[in-house]
UniProtKB/Swiss-Prot annotation:
Highest taxon in the source lineage: Bacteria
Binding site for substrate: F290, D291, V292, G293, G294, G295, L296, A297, V298, D299, Y300
Gene source species: Vibrio parahaemolyticus serotype O3:K6 (strain RIMD 2210633)
PANTHER family the UniProt entry points to: ARGININE DECARBOXYLASE (PTHR43295), BIOSYNTHETIC ARGININE DECARBOXYLASE (PTHR43295:SF9)
Location of N6-(pyridoxal phosphate)lysine modifications: K105
Gene Ontology molecular function: any one: metal ion binding
Protein's recorded name: Biosynthetic arginine decarboxylase
Organism lineage string: Bacteria, Pseudomonadati, Pseudomonadota, Gammaproteobacteria, Vibrionales
Reactions catalysed according to its record: L-arginine + H(+) = agmatine + CO2
Function recorded in the entry: Catalyzes the biosynthesis of agmatine from arginine.
Disulfide-linked positions: none
Keyword line: Decarboxylase, Lyase, Magnesium, Metal-binding, Polyamine biosynthesis, Pyridoxal phosphate, Spermidine biosynthesis
């Protein structure tokens, strides 16, 4: 009984270390066996271990890495956002409705868009629309949107073809809003609407003075890339009045930026934009839709804070602030309350996808005995040994800092003297081993309670951490972790009862020093290393990278010609049985070569020529077969 209690206490501590309960929204967790599970159904009745899913993937001959999608999570996110706004509308007696518009730029994968639309297929009154920000996206949306879909919103810069396609969407039965980003677009819309005989639905993107904080703050404010200034807005209204087309202006739109962490910034932006709405209504524009754009954040680190990786509000608070603010401003200026639209793509899709891969090797530090050099050893090395002896004899907190600083300085001097030929290779190796031994002992003797020790302990943790080489490309699968230091939850998928054994950093398999994850969710903060169970080459070691369903796939690049990973769609039935409903195989080596315009047929001819010239006749068929197999194979490592 005592052992079970200790195990439960340890697992609770580990759950807190990974902060899973808070960033996962209940979709993921750690069970009592230390296994990470997914619970994608709305009733949360069933917990499916990821190890079982991986076993099934392997049974279907799918090698890691694999991106696993859970469409039931997408459905729940749609329902959750719509429910939050519907509740707020009821609470504040707001006399209009809410529409959720999905910007497909967040994740254009067909299975993702289909599931978003399917989430309300059984509802009589649907609250879903789609947004396009380019011609290719618009052409996709025109086909994917349900007939009579609530809305299609067209954002982004537009040429004549883009405008014509949007207007053609009206002929196809869609309700298409063309949002003006710059003044010149108005001429195009009016000309092509007349040419096609279509009455356009226009929107205005307002360039607000309000601005959020964080990585995407440049999306808002007076210097933002998109939107019309107050004077430009008035120019549009005057032009439409002259054309007798003011009734075409039906929507006002703004965008403060993605991942808005502070609800106050959201409220300020909505308030300013609602003032624009009321002023435009007073000028005669029959605007009926109020589009707050994106910004609904994802709590990647689970801290519920104003960090750029978090959010200090929930869905209900977000919806209440928007509905209440719009309602108050409209009431104050005696204007009708519009249909509220949000473009909440990140919040819709982030949670549904998990990248699973395997650790293919590690580099670890194990304390080794270091022997004293002879009396004729260089003075520099003798000083290092003296520090080691002082550390073993026991020292006060201040002396520990001095030993650390001295060791840092001495090791730098060792490297300098080796470069100039004063020290030889054996002496350099001895100094490096001794410094690691000193760092290890310092990490055990220093205390996090001492504020002067904390930054040193962070540095020592990085120095002594295990290096886990994971079979994936950071640039392909987690580009935001590299490009903007986005934090994604990362954790081993099994054996977490022993997760306090080691600390590690995750490195990818690209030939690039940037291919490393630098930040990890750890309790209520971010650390530079991750607590993990010790790695063993005798059994598979699986890592999960969570909340990767927004932006990562489409932003991923092909560094070192690592291509798209395999992906699999997993559903769970009411009995707790899971099924791999769909598999999309990742890129082969040949696929990637063709993408960069390498003539694969010429490659094959070159192989044949080289083999015929250099390889014994009895080996030629086997060598050619292996080369051909390599071209057809997965771009990631397969023999681990």
């Amino acid at each position: 009984m005592r052992i079970e209690l200790e195990k439960a206490t340890k697992l609770d501590r580990i759950r807190a270390d990974y902060n899973v309960h808070y960033w996962s929204q209940g979709f993921y967790g750690i069970d009592d066996q230390g296994e990470v599970y997914v619970s994608p159904r709305s009733d949360r009745a069933h917990q499916i271990p990821f190890s079982a899913i991986v076993n099934e993937l392997e049974a279907q001959q799918l090698n890691l890495p694999v991106l696993v999608r859970f469409p039931q999570i997408v459905h729940q996110r749609v329902h959750g956002i719509c429910h939050a706004f519907n509740q707020a509308i009821e609470e504040y007696q707001y006399p209009n409705k809410y529409l959720l518009v999905y910007p497909i730029k967040v994740n254009q994968q067909r299975e993702v868009v289909d599931e978003i639309l399917a989430s309300q297929a059984q509802l009589e009154t649907k609250q879903l629309g789609l947004e396009a920000g380019s011609k290719p996206e618009l052409l996709a949306v025109l086909a994917l949107a349900q007939q009579g879909s609530s809305v299609i919103v067209c954002n982004g810069y537009k040429d004549r073809e883009y405008v014509r396609l949007a207007l053609i969407g009206e002929k196809l039965g869609h309700k298409v809003f063309i949002v003006l980003e710059k003044l010149s677009e108005l001429d195009l819309v009016l000309e092509e609407a007349k040419s096609l005989g279509v009455k356009p639905r226009l929107g205005l993107r307002i360039r607000l003075a309000s601005q959020g904080a964080g990585k995407w703050q440049a999306s808002g404010g007076e210097k933002s890339k998109f939107g019309l200034s107050a004077s430009q807005v008035l120019s549009v209204i005057e032009r439409l009045k002259r054309e007798g087309s003011l009734d075409a202006m039906q929507l006002v739109h703004f965008h403060l930026g993605s991942q808005m962490a502070n609800i106050r910034d959201v409220r300020n932006g909505v308030n300013e934009s609602a003032r624009f709405y009321c002023e435009l209504r007073a000028l005669g524009a029959n605007i009926e839709y109020f589009d707050v754009g994106g910004g609904l954040a994802v709590d990647y680190d689970g801290t519920r804070s104003q960090s750029s990786n978090s959010m200090n509000y929930g869905l209900a608070e977000y919806a209440r602030n928007i509905v209440n603010t719009v309602g108050d401003v409209c009431q104050q200026y005696e204007q009708p309350m519009p249909v509220i639209i949000s473009e909440s793509g990140r919040s819709l899709t982030a949670h549904h996808a998990v990248l699973i891969s395997n650790v293919i090797g590690t580099e670890t530090y194990q304390p080794e005995e270091v022997h004293e050099l002879g009396v004729d050893a260089p003075l520099l090395l003798q000083n290092m040994w003296r520090n080691w002896e002082n550390l073993q004899d026991g020292t006060d907190a201040r002396a520990l800092i001095e030993i650390y600083n001295d060791t840092q300085s001495d090791l730098a001097e060792v490297h300098s003297q080796f470069a100039t030929g004063v020290l030889n290779l054996e002496q350099r190796a001895w100094a490096e081993q001794l410094s690691l031994r000193i760092y290890f002992e310092l990490s055990r003797k220093m205390s996090t309670k001492n504020r002067f020790h904390r930054p040193i302990l962070d540095e020592l943790s990085e120095r002594l951490a295990d290096k886990f080489f994971v079979n994936f490309s950071l640039f392909q699968s987690l580009p935001d972790a590299w490009g903007i230091d986005q934090v994604f939850p990362v954790l081993p998928l099994s054996g977490l009862g022993d997760a306090e054994e080691r600390r590690a950093v995750m490195l990818d398999i690209t030939c690039d020093s940037d291919g490393a994850i630098d930040h990890y969710v750890d309790g209520q903060g971010i650390e530079s290393t991750l607590p993990v169970p010790a790695w063993s080459k005798d059994k598979p070691y699986l890592m999960g990278f969570f909340l990767v369903g927004a932006y990562q796939e489409i932003l991923g690049d092909m560094h070192n010609l690592f291509g798209d990973t395999h992906s699999a769609v997993v559903n769970v039935d009411e009995h707790g049985q899971f099924e791999i409903s769909y598999i999309n195989e990742g890129d082969s080596v040949e696929d990637m070569m063709r993408y960069v315009h390498i003539d694969v047929d010429a490659i094959r001819d070159n192989y044949k020529q080289l083999v015929s010239q250099r390889v014994e006749a009895n080996e030629q068929a086997q060598i050619l077969a292996e080369l051909e197999q390599g071209l057809a194979g997965y771009t990631y490592l397969e023999d681990f």
